[in-house]
Amino acid sequence: MAGHSKWANIQYRKGAQDAKRGKLFTRLIREITVAARLEGGDPATSPRLRTAIDKAFAANMPKDNIERAIKRGTGDLEGVAYEEVRYEGYGPYGVAVMVDCMTDNRNRTVAEIRHVFSKWGGNLGTDGSVAYLFSKKGIISYSKESNEDAIMEVAIEGGAEDVVTNEDSSIDVFTEPEEFSTVKKALDEAGLKAEQAEITQHASTSVSLALEEARKMLDFLDALEELDDVQQVYSNADFSEEILAQLG
C-alpha cells in the first residue's frame, strides 16, 4: 500500500518549529503531567505516560524534569491543574482541523483558537463537526533506508493493523491504540529503531493543495501551534512530495 507519509503531511516541520519556539519541553511536560494524573505515575502500566516519557528522552529532556512532571501529575508536587480540551473546525480550502489543547482557562483558549481560524478564513465548529473524519491510531514511522521486509514481518506478527510504504520509500506502521505499546516494543526489541512513534489522529480522507494553497495552510497550522495552550494540531491537508520540496 503506497501513500504520502503521515509525518511529511502533518508534521514535516513541526519539530523544527517546536525547537525554534522553545515550546517542545512545555508541551511534553504538560503531556507527562496529565498522563500521570489520569493513568498513574508508573510507565509500565500507562502506555500514554510511557510514550510521553520516550518522547521527552528523545528530545533530551533532563530526567529531573520528567520526574517532577510525573510527581505534579500524581499530586506529590503542587502544579497547575490542566484540563484537556479539543476544538474542531475547517481551515482554508475546506481542510478539516482538530486542535488538542491543555489549558487552565477554557475561555482564554477558545478565544485564541477562534481568532486564528477567523484570521485565516476558517471556521471553528462544534464538537464532532470534523472528528468523524479522523480515527485514533498508533503510527510508528521509519526512514526510507529501513528494512521494509523486517519491519513488516515483526509489525504484523506483533499485532499491527497495517504497514504502509510511502512514495518516498519511508514506512509507516499503523496500530490500534491499545496495541501500540505491544507493537512498538516488538519492533524495538528486533532492533528496528523508529524515527517517530505516537498515538495520533489519522484522517480517512484528504484535501490536496496546490503550492500557494499549501503555503497558506502551513502558515495557518503554524499560527495554531504557536498558541501556548495548543498541544497538537491535526488536519487532513495532503501536501505532495513535489509541493513539500518547493516549500523547502
UniProtKB/Swiss-Prot annotation:
SUPFAM superfamilies: YebC-like. Its main location: cytoplasm. It is found in: Cytoplasm. GO terms for cellular component: cytosol. InterPro entries: Integrase-like_N, TACO1_YebC-like_2nd/3rd_dom, TACO1_YebC_N, Transcrip_reg_TACO1-like, Transcrip_reg_TACO1-like_dom3, YebC-like. GO terms for molecular function: DNA binding. It holds the Pfam family Transcrip_reg. Keywords: Cytoplasm, DNA-binding, Transcription, Transcription regulation. GO terms for biological process: regulation of DNA-templated transcription. Belongs to the TACO1 family. This is Probable transcriptional regulatory protein Noc_0137. It comes from Nitrosococcus oceani (strain ATCC 19707 / BCRC 17464 / JCM 30415 / NCIMB 11848 / C-107).
